C-alpha cells in the first residue's frame, strides 16, 4: 500500500495515525468559519484552506471538517515515492509540513530527498531551513528574536517547524507522544 493510500485509509478509518494527522493540522492551522487573510495576505478559511477562498466567505464546521479530510488526502500526494516503511511519526510530521508549504514545495524539497534515503537526522535539520516568509516583498526570518523576544510576525511558524523537525527526525516514540508534545507546547 502506498503512503498516500495509507493516509487516506487512516483518515477514513479513524485510526491513530488519521486522528493524529487531523489533530495536528487542526491545532497548527487553527479554525475560522469566516475567510480572513493570513500573515502572508492569502485568503484562508476553515483549517487553512486557501483554494477558491474569497473575502466574505463563510462555511459551516461540518463543511470545514469535510474539506479538511479531502485536503489531507490531496496533500498526501506529496509523499508519493517515499518508503512505505517510514515510521508513522515521520509521516505525521511530513503531512503537517506539506499542509503548510504545499504539495509542490514538499515534493521538491531537500526534506523529501533525505526521507527517501531514510536519513532522518539530516531531514530534521533540513526542515529548519524552512523558516522564512515574505510579506509585501519583505523577507522575515521566523526564528529571529527582536529585542530579546520572539518576533511577532511569524514566531508561531518557527515553533511549528521545530515540532515538524522533531517528528520528521523520528524523535517521538509514538503518534500520541508527538501530538501531546505539540499540544503542550513541548515540540520546541
Residue ranges and their predicted role:
Residues 1-11, 19-40, 49, 53, ...:
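Long, amphipathic alpha-helical surface segments
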Residues 40-42, 89:
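Extracytoplasmic
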Residues 73-112:
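Active-site nucleophile-His-acid catalytic modules used for acyl/amide transfer and hydrolysis
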Amino acid at each position: 500500500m502506498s503512503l498516500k493510500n495509507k493516509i487516506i485509509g487512516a483518515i477514513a478509518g479513524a485510526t491513530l495515525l488519521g486522528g493524529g494527522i487531523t489533530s495536528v493540522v487542526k491545532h497548527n492551522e487553527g479554525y475560522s468559519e469566516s475567510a480572513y487573510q493570513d500573515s502572508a495576505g492569502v485568503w484562508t478559511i476553515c483549517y487553512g484552506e486557501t483554494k477558491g477562498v474569497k473575502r466574505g466567505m463563510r462555511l459551516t464546521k461540518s463543511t470545514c471538517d469535510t474539506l479538511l479530510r479531502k485536503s489531507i488526502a490531496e496533500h498526501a500526494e506529496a509523499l508519493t515515492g517515499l518508503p512505505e516503511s517510514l515510521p508513522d511519526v515521520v509521516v505525521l510530521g511530513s503531512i503537517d509540513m506539506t499542509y503548510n508549504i504545499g504539495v509542490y514545495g514538499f515534493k521538491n524539497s531537500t526534506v523529501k530527498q533525505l526521507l527517501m534515503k531514510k536519513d532522518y537526522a539530516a531531514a530534521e535539520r533540513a526542515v529548519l531551513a524552512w523558516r522564512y516568509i515574505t510579506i509585501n516583498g519583505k523577507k522575515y526570518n521566523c526564528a529571529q528574536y527582536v529585542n530579546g523576544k520572539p518576533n511577532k510576525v511569524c514566531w508561531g511558524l518557527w515553533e511549528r517547524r521545530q515540532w515538524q523537525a522533531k517528528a520528521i527526525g523520528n524523535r517521538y516514540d509514538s503518534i500520541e507522544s508527538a501530538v501531546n508534545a505539540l499540544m503542550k507546547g513541548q515540540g520546541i
